[in-house]
């Protein structure tokens, strides 16, 4: 199944704040609420529907396919500890998400384009794989050409850039960043109940 490329407002109306999907979330949600009208009511979800909704939050926020999400679930199950938290770590430590969390792109989709087009380097090598798993001590930098630097500088100047999490360090003067560790659960801005996602897949696999 391919990634969603349809209207983002439709998704945020249904699932709520998805910081990785759109940087205009507050404005979009406000418009959505105005358009719904006072008479509209939400259908009460079943337990399955609630679990499905939480799964959809991950899928749309991180821009991954169903196949990729299932693969991350299977990997997370093989590691000692909370499967849900390991799942979030896999998603958060992806290169495209790391570029986004550093503020080098306004959305994860935008960060994925930077990676795909060869603008991002990891440890002095161009990496064009968005799913590349960033590791502690990895050093990210921008390809040394005007186009790459200008793209990133424009993104950094955007007021929508959120606070950089503690496991990442960005040096704006050199446009380099260091991965200092693994992301902490409290640093993840997405409102998600990862346990419900694990429960959803336990009934699917």
Swiss-Prot record:
The alphabetical list of record keywords is: Chloroplast, Plastid, Ribonucleoprotein, Ribosomal protein, RNA-binding, rRNA-binding
Which BP terms from GO are recorded? ribosomal small subunit biogenesis; translation
Q: List residues traversing the bilayer.
A: none
Query: Key word rRNA-binding present in the record?
Result: yes
User: What role does it play?
Assistant: One of the primary rRNA binding proteins, it binds directly to 16S rRNA where it nucleates assembly of the body of the 30S subunit. With S5 and S12 plays an important role in translational accuracy.
The similarity comment for this entry is: Belongs to the universal ribosomal protein uS4 family.
What does the record note on quaternary structure?
Answer: Part of the 30S ribosomal subunit. Contacts protein S5. The interaction surface between S4 and S5 is involved in control of translational fidelity.
Per its record, how is this protein called by name? Small ribosomal subunit protein uS4c
């Amino acid at each position: 199944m391919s990634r969603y490329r349809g209207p983002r407002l439709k998704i945020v109306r249904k699932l709520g704040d998805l910081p990785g999907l759109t940087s205009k979330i507050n404005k979009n949600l406000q418009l959505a609420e105005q358009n719904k009208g006072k008479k509209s009511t939400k259908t009460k979800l079943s337990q399955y529907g609630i679990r499905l909704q939480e799964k959809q939050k991950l899928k749309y926020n991180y821009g991954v396919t169903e196949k990729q999400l299932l693969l991350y679930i299977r990997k997370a199950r093989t590691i000692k500890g909370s499967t849900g938290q390991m799942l979030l770590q896999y998603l958060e430590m992806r290169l495209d998400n790391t570029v986004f969390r550093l503020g080098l792109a306004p959305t994860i989709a935008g960060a994925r384009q930077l990676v795909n087009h060869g603008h991002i380097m990891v440890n002095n090598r161009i990496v064009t794989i968005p799913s590349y798993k960033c590791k502690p001590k990895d050093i990210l930098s921008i390809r040394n050409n005007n186009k790459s630097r200008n793209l990133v500088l424009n993104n950094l100047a955007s007021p929508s850039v959120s606070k950089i999490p503690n496991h990442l360090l960005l040096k704006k003067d050199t446009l380099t960043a260091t991965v200092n560790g693994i992301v902490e659960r409290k640093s993840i801005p997405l409102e998600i109940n990862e346990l419900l996602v694990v429960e959803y897949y336990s009934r699917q696999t």
